[in-house]
């Protein structure tokens, strides 16, 4: 829904995780952006200013790079990362400049999953399919067979397969059509 309404997920997550920071920077409450239906957020007065502020935090001092932190939360959550691993990953990616507590890591990841509960549902569905069939398929139906023992260590790889393989297939189809058009300009455009 965010994508359809022109809102980057990283921006929205940063908004929700660090609302007090944005309120202090703007000198006004941002509660209306946090409580509005997603379809209305970008239409609210002042959204453009807030959106730019959140993105600009990527250029603030390392410990205040809230957009970066939110981006890391999104990626970690999408791959099913647990709080201890997320803490270490954030510390590594920030070159040792962003250190958060275990409680903060848990809160950040839980906030993301509260905002997007369908992600955990998709994770469960993916693991169930993997355990049952040993095969996952991308959105074009292309399979990936998992031949080793199915355990938690391979969940990240399983979660990554469908979206990454689907994008790879789309790219392949697009380049094939472009090459065909180059070689035969009379082929109608799709």
Describe these PLM feature segments.
Residues 1-190:
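Conserved catalytic core of nucleotide polymerization and phosphodiester-bond processing enzymes
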């Amino acid at each position: 829904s965010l994508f359809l309404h022109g809102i980057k997920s990283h921006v929205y997550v940063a908004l929700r995780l660090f609302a007090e920071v944005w309120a202090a920077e703007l000198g006004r409450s941002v509660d209306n952006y946090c409580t509005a239906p997603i379809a209305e957020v970008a239409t609210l007065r002042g959204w453009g200013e807030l959106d730019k502020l959140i993105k600009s935090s990527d250029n603030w001092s390392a410990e205040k790079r809230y957009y970066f932190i939110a981006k890391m939360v999104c990626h970690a959550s999408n791959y099913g990362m647990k709080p201890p691993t997320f803490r270490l990953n954030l510390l590594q990616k920030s070159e040792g400049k962003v250190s958060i507590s275990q409680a903060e890591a848990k809160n950040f990841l839980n906030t993301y999953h509260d905002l997007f509960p369908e992600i955990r549902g998709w994770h469960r569905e993916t693991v169930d399919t993997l355990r049952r069939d040993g095969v996952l398929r991308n959105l074009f139906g292309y399979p990936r067979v998992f031949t080793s023992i199915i355990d938690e260590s391979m969940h990240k790889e399983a979660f990554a397969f469908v979206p990454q393989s689907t994008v790879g297939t789309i790219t392949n189809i697009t380049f094939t059509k472009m090459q065909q058009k180059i070689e035969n300009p009379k082929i109608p455009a799709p």
